[in-house]
Regions:
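Short flexible/disordered coil segments
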Residues: 168-172, 228-237, 313, 317
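Active-site-proximal region of nucleotide-activated glycan assembly enzymes
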Residues: 126-195
Length: 386
């Protein structure tokens, strides 16, 4: 179903932006669908196809504008944050809740207007946080503001919904009934968290027994951001130049943010628009990445060491943590092809990095992320967990 709202659903997912926001939302929905709950997704043009492909019923926004996928977030931050906190999104979510009558909502944490709508409708609402929440919470506790909240616009929206204003950034972020963080607590920044903050870890990871490729031709996954980021084409080119001529094979997942025509691809690199990382990673010896949280945690869940070259946002933190865990090497964005080749050679030659990644994989498995998330979400809606 696309665009229709004639039937009820048990859980409504409010999505808007793509990139790293979307996969954990859909993974959370899949966990509920596996419990025989009917899950619907409120989707923009950026998220609709992925939601349909995941098997969910999809309804569209009626008032809210679509996100701008051609511009880096940093270049449109004020506009994007105002839209995400704006009344149009809130009214669309309110209408969807009124018509579909879900028992709970799961909302992208970057959509404060949708969270406010859930509060106004009295629907149990979970904010799905897809980055290390400790970073944001520590910043807000210092009174240094919040990364992604236009509080003035949000309070205008809350006023229109007859809600009290958010007193500060932390109050805005922690207004939902549950903050479900898709990061292991031991990976996040150590700080105090209220009980409503639940660290589950990466959701929907499908691990397999380890499979090693040829020792002479190890396979390396090259995975970068699916959204536009400054410096990304140059980084991908330097990584490809570093790998050219090396005794290895690589698969480059080149998403919609970078055109393949802009990159000189060496003969030992296969380019694909998309790959199922859970199927691919068991064959890989290592991962080269910008350090986005989704790729970082999935590599760790599969016990794969990483070479990380952060582009920005939370990626510096993720790369640093991977290094502290002994599971990766962290290089600056401007590293040369020679420096990248040298670091990758060390990563593949020194077994300590693979051992560090295996320890992280065991820790993630012990956390039981899917069960933790399912229990938290069903508990929020007071649905019996079996």
């Amino acid at each position: 179903m696309t665009g229709e709202r004639s039937a009820r659903c048990d859980a409504l997912i409010a999505s808007w932006g793509s990139g790293g926001n979307l996969p954990p939302l859909l993974a959370a929905g899949a966990l509920l669908a596996a419990r025989d709950l009917r899950v619907c997704v409120l989707a923009s043009s950026a998220t609709q196809q992925a939601a349909v492909d995941a098997g969910f019923d999809v309804v569209g926004y009626r008032r809210a504008r679509d996100p701008d996928l051609k511009t880096a977030f940093e270049d449109q931050a004020d506009r994007a944050m105002a839209t995400a906190a704006g009344l149009e999104i809130a009214l669309d979510v309110r209408d969807a809740v009124a018509e579909l009558k879900p028992q709970l909502m799961i909302v992208d944490c970057m959509l404060p207007a949708a969270l406010a709508a859930g509060e106004a409708m009295g629907t149990p609402t979970a904010s799905l946080v897809h980055f290390p929440y400790g970073l944001a919470r520590t910043q807000m506790l210092r009174g240094a503001g919040a990364w992604t909240t236009d509080r003035a616009q949000l309070n205008d929206t809350r006023h229109a919904l007859r809600l009290a204003p958010a007193a500060d950034a932390l109050a805005a972020w922690e207004s939902p009934d549950l903050l479900l963080v898709t990061v292991p607590k031991w990976f996040d920044l150590p700080t105090e968290y209220p009980a409503k903050v639940v660290h589950a870890g990466p959701l929907g990871v499908r691990t397999e027994p380890r499979r090693s490729g040829s020792a002479k031709q190890p396979l390396v996954l090259l995975s970068f951001s699916t959204t536009v980021m400054h410096g990304q084409p140059g980084l991908i080119q330097r990584v490809c130049d570093a790998i050219s001529g090396e005794g290895l094979r690589a698969i480059l997942t080149l998403g919609p943010a970078v055109s393949g025509e802009a990159i000189r691809i060496p003969g030992n690199v296969e380019v694909v628009p998309y790959a199922d990382h859970d199927q691919l990673l068991p064959r890989c010896a290592a991962v080269v990445t910008h350090g986005g949280l989704g790729t970082t945690l999935r590599a760790l869940a599969h016990g794969k060491p990483m070479l990380l070259l952060p582009l920005g946002r939370d990626q510096e933190f993720n790369a640093r943590r991977a290094g502290e865990l002994g599971a990766g090497i962290h290089l600056p964005l401007g590293a040369s092809p020679n420096e990248i080749a040298s670091a990758l050679g060390e990563l593949l030659a020194q077994p300590s990095y693979a051992e560090g990644a295996e320890r992280a994989a065991a820790a993630i498995a012990a956390d039981r992320p899917d069960q933790t998330a399912t229990e938290a979400l069903l508990g929020l809606a007071k649905i019996k967990f079996e």
